[in-house]
Amino acid sequence: AKETLNGTLTVTLDKTSIEEVSEEYTCKLEFNAVERDALGENIPDPVSFTSDSWKTIQKAVQTGNTSKYNIGDTKKVNLGDLGTHTVRISNMSACTNGEASETACGFVVEFADIITTHQFNSTNTNVGGWKDSEMRTYVNGTIYKALPSELQNVIISTKVISSHGSTSSETNFETQDKLYLLNAQEVWNTNDYDTSVGTTK
């Protein structure tokens, strides 16, 4: 039998009597979700974030086998016409039930350099915030589609809480995104109107 990810293979034998002198056994294999996903694939154990494939990284994160990875570890990613860029591990701590947003918990990877430039909106407005912005459409469309398919396949949707700005009649926005931007506090260590600070940490 193939060794499962956690080293345990559950086998249940249902005994069925055919004749007095012969017996037939039905073998039933039971796998957990992680085992089913990787069954039949020979995914190597982790060596380093820089050299491991995205499938190896995904398996390591799913099984909690991340001792070879550290915050700040980097890896090159080819985005085709957008060039080759560097990503790095920015967080490895698990999300807890009390998190208002998932952008700063779990296994988070960020770009360490500037991919390209793009307007937040084509007109001089930020009404609707990140949720309704052309930037969000661009990042989760053009940028996401430029990623290697192996990387796309391991990115999960993330609950993102973003600011409503200086207006007083709105609440913070909530979206589900594959990719998202760093908030002002994370980039400049300060902010003027970012009402999401404290909810995205």
What role is predicted for each listed range?
Residues 2-41:
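C-terminal, structured domain-capping segment
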Residues 42-201:
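Collagenous Gly-X-Y triple-helix signature in extracellular proteins
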